[in-house]
């Protein structure tokens, strides 16, 4: 029983010159989540909707796609915000660990309460980094965690309880 307000989400970077960044990976992740939650999805229709949304957009933008349980798609687009240079702490660790067994951590959905709550606790920060019940770093509320070590880019394993980012 899925409430009607529950949706699957994708947030995509749209650049005037190159189009959607990692579009195929976003569509693949959306289709995987649709299968998991039993949402009907027409990937070709989703692609056409995104292409129509991009038409005439100038400059970098953030596109947001929402898939409902009946298969309908809604979109929004907004210019990229300049976060500037924050004064004070940029990030903090979440006060409560996440449960790596929580299936919602592995899918980008409208069920984002855990992220919202932790961000609200730290209005001085632009992001909050989560750890799981084993103390493993997982992800940020609005970002992926990427560590550069000896020329390699390392990310936490998805099994730690995090969204399978498209840039992994």
Where are these regions (language model features)?
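Helix-start/capping segments and mature chain N-termini
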Residues: 1-62, 66-168
């Amino acid at each position: 029983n899925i409430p009607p307000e529950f949706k699957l989400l994708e947030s995509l970077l749209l650049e005037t010159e190159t189009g959607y960044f990692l579009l195929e990976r976003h569509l693949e992740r959306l289709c995987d989540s649709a299968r998991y939650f039993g949402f009907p999805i027409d990937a070709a229709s989703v692609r056409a909707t995104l292409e129509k949304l991009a038409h005439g957009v100038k400059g970098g933008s953030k596109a947001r796609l929402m898939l409902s349980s009946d298969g309908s798609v809604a979109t929004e687009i907004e210019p990229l915000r300049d976060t500037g240079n924050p004064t004070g702490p940029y990030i903090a660790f979440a006060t409560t660990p996440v449960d790596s067994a929580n299936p919602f951590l592995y899918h980008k959905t409208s069920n984002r309460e855990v992220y919202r709550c932790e961000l609200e606790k730290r209005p001085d920060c632009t992001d909050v980094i989560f750890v799981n019940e084993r103390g493993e770093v997982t992800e940020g509320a609005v970002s992926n965690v990427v560590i550069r070590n000896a020329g390699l880019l390392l990310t936490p394993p998805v099994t730690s309880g995090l969204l399978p980012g498209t840039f992994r």
